[in-house]
Amino acid sequence: MKLLQLQYFCTACKYNNITRASEELHISQPSISNAIKELEAEFGVILFKRLKKGFTLTREGETLLRHAQELLQHAERITKIMTDRGPENNSIRIGIQIGRAHV
C-alpha cells in the first residue's frame, strides 16, 4: 500500500467518479483505476461497485476511506512538522511528479 494509491482512492471517493478525480489530480483515468485495483488485490476485497456513472462504496471501501483519510492527514502533519524543524526551514522546496506537471 502506498500513500499515492490512497490519495487516488480518496479523491475518487470525493467525487464518486474516477474521471473527475483524474481531472483534479491531472493524471490519467487508468492510473487511478490501476491504483485502486492494486489496493483491491493487496487487501483481497472489492472497494466499490462500479456503476454506469460513478460507483458506490462497499463496506470495505467505506472502512478504507475513513482510515485512508486519517492516514493522509497524519502524513501531511508529519511532513509539516519535520520540514518546520529542519535546518533549512527558511527555504522552499517544490516537488512535482512528472505526471502532474503542467506547462
Name what the model sees in each region.
Residues 9, 40-57, 79:
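A short LG(V/I)-centered, amphipathic sequence patch enriched
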Residues 84-100:
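Interdomain hinge and pocket-entrance segments immediately C-terminal to HTH DNA-binding domains
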Residues 42-43, 64-86:
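Alpha-helical linker/hinge and terminal dimerization helices associated
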Residues 10-28:
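Short helix-boundary/capping micro-motifs
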Residues 2-5, 29, 54, 61, ...:
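The N-cap/first-turn positions of alpha helices
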Residues 15, 24, 37-46:
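Residue cluster at the C-terminal edge of the helix-turn-helix DNA-binding motif
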